[in-house]
Amino acid sequence: MAETTKTHVILLACGSFNPITKGHIQMFERARDYLHKTGKFIVIGGIISPVHDSYGKQGLVSSRHRLNMCQLAVQNSDWIRVDPWECYQDTWQTTCSVLEHHRDLMKRVTGCILSNVNTPSVTPVIGQSLNQSTQPVYQNSNLSNKPTAVRILGKVGEGLSRMCCVRPNLQRVTFVDENANLGTVMRYEEIELRILLLCGSDLLESFCIPGLWNESDMEVIVGDFGIVVVPRDSVEPEQIINHSSLLRKYKNNILTVKDDSNHPMAVVSSTKSRLALQHGDGHVVDYLAQPVIDYVLKSQLYINTSG
């Protein structure tokens, strides 16, 4: 399949990341590898979106610490970045609203075609050419001094060269006009870009719990965006899908990562990581990256808590 006809994908993972584990990063890597192997997708970026402090989960440390740990966990990645938008809102945001925020942001910033699974868009957003030196200003009076997500595309097919949080002197994001070329590869209007929710099979299983999720939100998440599921703890996504009429309805929008990996996906568990820290268990190095461990110890996180 030609690169111009492949769907370009940004993987978005929402969660507490309390703390972020090696398994969380493995989920991104495994999902990207699998999607590339299908020949239908090009994963150009990954976004980690930690939950707001008001989520109310026992033992949840402040978003300041969780954002810092996430940044340390991905500091050597050239395609996974941490986005603070969810943490900086006035209150907790639903997964659906986070997905919609990033979809709308990408429309404004990139000029790419962003499509739902079943209703692909045909009208790109019109703005300023990316390769021009002058940058128009996108006004947002609520930005204050908070980090702003800025996305700069490198060569399509090689992924995002940067998706990071900065504190600009001016409140700006770059736009792309309808005639702009993306380097020498293709026109922006020819790129179909989708944001897919990345999760483990445990989150997918929670869709089957009555009353836990808003029905209309589930419809949007699965029906409009789509999900990439990484199996964990021997929970098979296919079995979960068969237990939900809504998941069965949109089963073609649920992509299950199938690979030969022997990664023990249980190490995604932040709970096990916290317990290892509390008990001084040396196996914590199996769960957390060393920079995250160093940060936890320096900040005295989780050591004296039972969350």
Curated annotation (Swiss-Prot):
EC number: 2.7.7.1, 2.7.7.18
Reaction(s) catalysed by this chain's protein: beta-nicotinamide D-ribonucleotide + ATP + H(+) = diphosphate + NAD(+); nicotinate beta-D-ribonucleotide + ATP + H(+) = deamido-NAD(+) + diphosphate
Superkingdom in the source lineage: Eukaryota
Annotated ATP binding sites: 24, 271-274
Cellular compartments per GO CC: axon; cytoplasmic vesicle membrane; Golgi membrane
Keywords tagged on the record: ATP-binding, Cell projection, Cytoplasm, Cytoplasmic vesicle, Golgi apparatus, Lipoprotein, Membrane, NAD, Nucleotide-binding, Nucleotidyltransferase, Pyridine nucleotide biosynthesis, Transferase
Pathway participation: Cofactor biosynthesis; NAD(+) biosynthesis; NAD(+) from nicotinamide D-ribonucleotide: step 1/1; Cofactor biosynthesis; NAD(+) biosynthesis; deamido-NAD(+) from nicotinate D-ribonucleotide: step 1/1
Residue sites binding NAD(+) per the record: 16-17, 92, 95, 200, 202, 212-213, 232
Key word Iron present: no
Textual note on the cofactor: Divalent metal cations. Mg(2+) confers the highest activity.
CDD domains, per database record: NMNAT_Eukarya
Membrane topology according to the record: Lipid-anchor
Swiss-Prot/TrEMBL cofactor(s): Mg(2+)
Subcellular locations according to the entry: Golgi apparatus membrane; Cytoplasmic vesicle membrane; Cytoplasm; Cell projection, Axon
Gene Ontology biological process terms from the UniProt entry: NAD biosynthetic process
GO molecular function, one term: nicotinamide-nucleotide adenylyltransferase activity
InterPro entries named in the record: Cyt_trans-like, Euk_NMN_adenylyltrnsfrase, NMNAT_euk, Rossmann-like_a/b/a_fold
Subunit composition and interactions: Monomer.
Function: Nicotinamide/nicotinate-nucleotide adenylyltransferase that acts as an axon maintenance factor. Axon survival factor required for the maintenance of healthy axons: acts by delaying Wallerian axon degeneration, an evolutionarily conserved process that drives the loss of damaged axons. Catalyzes the formation of NAD(+) from nicotinamide mononucleotide (NMN) and ATP. Can also use the deamidated form; nicotinic acid mononucleotide (NaMN) as substrate but with a lower efficiency. Also catalyzes the reverse reaction, i.e. the pyrophosphorolytic cleavage of NAD(+).
Protein name per the record: Nicotinamide/nicotinic acid mononucleotide adenylyltransferase 2
Organism: Xenopus tropicalis
Lineage: Eukaryota, Metazoa, Chordata, Craniata, Vertebrata
